[in-house]
């Protein structure tokens, strides 16, 4: 369950970095 939360956070960070 925690892994899903971590993955979502990582995706958000990547999206901000790509922006």
From Swiss-Prot:
Q: Which UniProt keywords apply?
A: Membrane, Toxin-antitoxin system, Transmembrane, Transmembrane helix
Q: Does the keyword Lipid biosynthesis apply?
A: no
Task: From the record, give the transmembrane residue ranges.
Answer: 4-18
Report the membrane topology from the UniProt record. Single-pass membrane protein
Alphabetical list of InterPro entries matching this protein: Toxin_Ibs
What do mutants without this gene show? None seen. An isbD overproducing strain cannot be made in the absence of the sibD gene.
Q: Which domain of life is it from?
A: Bacteria
Q: What induces it?
A: The sibD sRNA probably represses expression of ibsD mRNA, either by destabilizing the transcript and/or preventing its translation. Expression of the proteinaceous toxin is controlled by antisense sRNA SibD.
Q: Where primarily located?
A: membrane
Which Pfam families does the annotation name? Answer: Ibs_toxin
A Gene Ontology cellular-component term? membrane
Where, per UniProt, does this protein localize? Membrane
Stated role:
Toxic component of a type I toxin-antitoxin (TA) system.
Query: What more does the record tell us?
Result: Part of the SIBd repeat region (formerly known as QUAD1d), encoded on the opposite strand from the sibD (formerly known as rygD) RNA.
Say which family it is in: Belongs to the Ibs toxic protein family.
- Supply the name of the protein: Small toxic protein IbsD
Provenance organism? Escherichia coli (strain K12)
């Amino acid at each position: 369950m925690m892994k899903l939360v971590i993955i979502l956070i990582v995706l958000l960070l990547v999206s901000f970095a790509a922006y």
